């Protein structure tokens, strides 16, 4: 049995999407047991529509719902101990739940997670890892917005943690890892990126294969399994990709509706367009993982539909099932030991 705590008030639509999404996950994985946190007047009527889910779940009342526009400091002051978001995270800390899933305010969720769960030993900064659709399948990109800036040591920690997720979600024994840079040549880029590359080249690692620097256009190609960057650049890359996908969809729609011949062509090509739309649908790869914390927290996109929220729950489910947290901690400890040994010999 895998226990997952849910911030039922999170996201643009709250319980109206969160609970149906959880119901979909329960249909696919009957060994999940949910603990829902939220305002009774809004959660209980929706939960009542899913009797099987309700019977296999627990509901705990909250006093406060964190708004999508609340500042992290404001959310901490108003929501600590009594908001659905805090209580869902705290359930992981107390051991009531194995993982937490929320579609709520990203800044507030990260602030509360850091405050409540604390960081892993020897990890200085958290990162958000996202699943990215590529020409070859999917890849992991991190950090996509947890913190701005990162030094070489932090970038290397991201590489180790990202490789751990790739092994669990993609079932790859030794994921390839690249550092996002302005060019693939070793002399290019900021000092911290070049230093991180040097560390990854010099330190023996069983759990990943360092492939050098990658450029922005390599992300969508699927050149590597894991792309590592700091949060400012990663978030811009994410928003650019999302905007480009929407732009392409709109341009295709306009082109296919412009003339009668185009409309006829669309009828014959509809299957291909449907497959493309499904490939680019953010709901199919929803679920950002907060890495570096001493517990599992999954961030669903705030505008996700029920299928999208279900995908986020499944990411948490897979992480627990694969004991990913313990493996990442072991990988980090092994890396830090190996790196210190290499550094002392140098």
Swiss-Prot record:
EC number: 2.3.1.274
One GO process term, biological-process aspect: fatty acid biosynthetic process
EC supergroup of this enzyme: transferase
Pfam families in alphabetical order: FA_synthesis
Metabolic or biological pathway, per its Swiss-Prot or TrEMBL entry: Lipid metabolism; phospholipid metabolism
Encoding gene (name): plsX
Location in or out of the cell: Cytoplasm
Species: Brucella suis biovar 1 (strain 1330)
GO CC list: cytoplasm
Name of the protein described by the UniProt record: Phosphate acyltransferase
GO MF annotations, alphabetized: phosphate:acyl-[acyl carrier protein] acyltransferase activity
Reactions listed under catalytic activity: a fatty acyl-[ACP] + phosphate = an acyl phosphate + holo-[ACP]
Keyword Cytoplasm among UniProt keywords: yes
HAMAP family documented for this protein: PlsX
Keywords for this protein: Cytoplasm, Lipid biosynthesis, Lipid metabolism, Phospholipid biosynthesis, Phospholipid metabolism, Transferase
């Amino acid at each position: 049995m895998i226990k997952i705590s849910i911030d039922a008030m999170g996201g643009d639509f709250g319980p109206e999407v969160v609970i149906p999404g959880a119901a979909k996950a329960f249909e696919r994985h009957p060994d999940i047991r949910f603990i829902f946190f939220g305002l009774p007047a809004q959660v209980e009527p929706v939960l009542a529509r899913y009797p099987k889910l309700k019977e296999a779940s627990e509901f705990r009342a909250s006093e406060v719902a964190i708004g999508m526009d609340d500042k992290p400091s404001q959310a901490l002051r108003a929501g600590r101990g009594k908001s659905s978001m805090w209580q869902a995270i705290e359930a992981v800390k107390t051991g009531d739940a194995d993982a937490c899933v929320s579609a709520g305010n990203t800044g507030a969720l990260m602030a509360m997670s850091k405050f409540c769960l604390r960081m892993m030993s020897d990890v200085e900064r958290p990162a958000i890892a996202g699943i990215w659709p590529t020409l070859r399948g999917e890849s992991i990109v991190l950090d996509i917005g947890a913190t701005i800036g990162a030094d070489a040591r932090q970038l290397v920690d991201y590489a180790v943690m990202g490789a751990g997720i790739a092994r669990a979600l993609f079932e790859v024994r030794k994921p390839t890892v690249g550092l996002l840079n302005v060019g693939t040549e070793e002399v290019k880029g900021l000092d911290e990126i070049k230093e991180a590359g040097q560390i990854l080249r010099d330190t023996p690692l069983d759990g990943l294969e360092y492939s050098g620097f990658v450029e922005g256009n390599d992300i969508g190609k699927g050149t590597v399994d894991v792309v590592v960057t700091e949060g400012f650049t990663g978030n811009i890359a994410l928003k650019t990709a999302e905007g480009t996908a929407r732009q392409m969809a709109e341009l295709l729609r306009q082109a296919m509706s412009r003339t009668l011949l185009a409309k006829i062509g669309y009828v014959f090509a509809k299957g291909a367009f449907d497959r493309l739309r499904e490939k680019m649908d953010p709901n199919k790869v929803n679920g950002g993982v907060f890495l570096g914390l001493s517990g599992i927290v999954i961030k669903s996109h705030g505008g996700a539909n029920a299928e999208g929220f279900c995908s986020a729950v499944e990411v948490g489910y897979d992480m627990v099932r694969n004991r990913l947290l313990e493996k990442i901690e072991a990988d980090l400890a092994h890396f830090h030991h190996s790196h210190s040994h290499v550094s002392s010999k140098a």
